[in-house]
Every structure is written in structure tokens, then in C-alpha cells.
Curated annotation (Swiss-Prot):
Protein name as catalogued: Large ribosomal subunit protein bL21
Ribonucleoprotein listed as a keyword: yes
Stretches that traverse the bilayer: none
Entry's family note: Belongs to the bacterial ribosomal protein bL21 family.
Keyword Cell inner membrane: no
Organism: Synechococcus sp. (strain CC9902)
Molecular function terms from GO: rRNA binding; structural constituent of ribosome
The protein's role, per its UniProt record: This protein binds to 23S rRNA in the presence of protein L20.
Subunit structure, interactors included: Part of the 50S ribosomal subunit. Contacts protein L20.
Gene Ontology cellular component annotations, sorted alphabetically: cytoplasm; ribonucleoprotein complex; ribosome
């Protein structure tokens, strides 16, 4: 009797290549074809951005560490939307003084999709 197991579905194409970049005052780990929420960037929706502050690039050939930045490396991002993060409540109370203060804050965010990571003009991953 033949084995009648269904064929395994192919996983979506993912790559182990990644880059660590500086954006919005923070260091972010980025992979291609994924979206990330960064602090608000001054860019329009559907605009393409190029980040040159690449600190590290890893691909199948090895890891390249910048000092402080990797030479001729860049990450291309597409702005998908401008959003606001979850509301954070700050509540301050002084006991026995009837003093209470309640503040809310929502961080302004930009959702971006990583289109490509390139080193020396060649896309990786």
C-alpha cells in the first residue's frame, strides 16, 4: 500500500539575511518583505525612503560590521501608513492631599515595509 500523506505546503520565501540600521534615534533589526513601526518619519504614504545608517549586514556569505557604518550599504523602505500607538495612561496621586493627575499619551508611528537591503549596489536576501 502506498503512503497517502498530503504533500507539504511550501513555506513563504523568507531569508536569513538582515540588517541593523539607525532610524528615529534607535537601532532596528530589519529583514526584507516585513513591515515595522518606527517613530514618526517625515515622509508621505507610498513614498520610498533610503536609509544609509546601516550598522551591520548579515547574509549567506557572512556578517559585515560597520565602524560605525557599513560602507556602500543601504536599506530601501516604503511608507505604508502613519499610525498612532496604543494609549499609555500616566496617573499620579498624592495620598491624603486630594491631588490627582491623569495623562494619556499615544506615540506617533510610521509603518514601513522593507523592500531591499543592498551592499555595494547589490541586493541581498
Amino acid at each position: 500500500m502506498a503512503d497517502t500523506k498530503p504533500a507539504a505546503k511550501a513555506a513563504p520565501e523568507t531569508s536569513d539575511a538582515y540588517a541593523i540600521v539607525e532610524a528615529s534615534g534607535t537601532q532596528i533589526w530589519l529583514q526584507t518583505n516585513r513591515y515595522y513601526d518606527l517613530d514618526r518619519l517625515q515622509a508621505d504614504v507610498d513614498e520610498t525612503l533610503k536609509l544609509d545608517n546601516v550598522l551591520l549586514v548579515k547574509d549567506s556569505k557572512g556578517t559585515t560590521l560597520g565602524q560605525p557604518y557599513v560602507k556602500d550599504a543601504s536599506v530601501e523602505l516604503k511608507v505604508m501608513a502613519h499610525r498612532r500607538g496604543p494609549k499609555v495612561i500616566v496617573y499620579k496621586m498624592r495620598p491624603k492631599k486630594k491631588t490627582r493627575r491623569k495623562n494619556g499619551h499615544r506615540q506617533e508611528l510610521t509603518r514601513v515595509m522593507v523592500q531591499s537591503i543592498s551592499v555595494g549596489g547589490k541586493a541581498i536576501g
